[in-house]
Amino acid sequence: LMKIKFGAGGIASYFDKVKNQEILQTDKFFGGEVIQMTAPGTAWEKVMPVNMNDFDKTSLHEFKTVRAIETPLRYLVEKEAKFSYFTLRERFILNKFSGELIVEADVQNWTGEKARELRIVFPVNLDKSFKASYEIPFGTVEMGRDEIDYSILPENYECQFNPDKYGRKDLPYREAVNWADVSSGDYRGKGCLFASDMTVHLFRDETT
């Protein structure tokens, strides 16, 4: 159903053989590639934009294969890269019969370096007209259509909705309960459904 090729920092190609479509666009980042950015401030007291200071990514290091297994149901490839402050151990698991891809990432031997943020990148092969939706408690929200404009809320200095913390700006991230969907919005169109145990998802590239 699916064909995967690995590159220097993760998945170089995730090809749907049934639809004859390339799922990822990996000219800048690989699928599942881990990037490191500097995140000044704190998540609760002083929210500040991330920046490119001390930027790092998987493809800048040797990403060696430490285990490769095939079972009747799936393929598993485990790879490892040594960053400056930690060792990344990442597993790519492909279900043979559904095309489902599972990516598991472990950060080992972290040195405790402050103000660093790690992100896992999945560059879906879509143009800027894509539609994104995500799960919330008891429902689904589509970005740009169903969301509340938080900038019109009255100031409340006990939460994030005040000028010093929120700045009356559009949040770059979304908090999803279990899944986020990014697609062309067309019937039988391109896209991906991401089921994740991570809460915060970003839908635009903040690197320069």
Predicted regions and their residues:
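Generic beta-strand/beta-sheet core signal
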Residues: 7, 104-108, 123, 196, ...
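Acidic glycine/proline-rich low-complexity segments
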Residues: 16-51, 128-161, 165
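Short structured motifs
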Residues: 61-65, 87-91, 136-138, 147, ...
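Beta-strand-rich recognition/accessory modules
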Residues: 169-208
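Catalytic and substrate-binding regions of extracellular carbohydrate-active enzymes
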Residues: 1-109
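Generic recognition of stable, solvent-exposed alpha-helical segments in well-folded globular domains
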Residues: 6-9, 72, 100, 113-117, ...
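Generic structural signal for residues positioned in beta-strands
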Residues: 3, 13, 76, 119-121, ...
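Acidic (Asp/Glu-rich), glycine- and aromatic
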Residues: 97-142
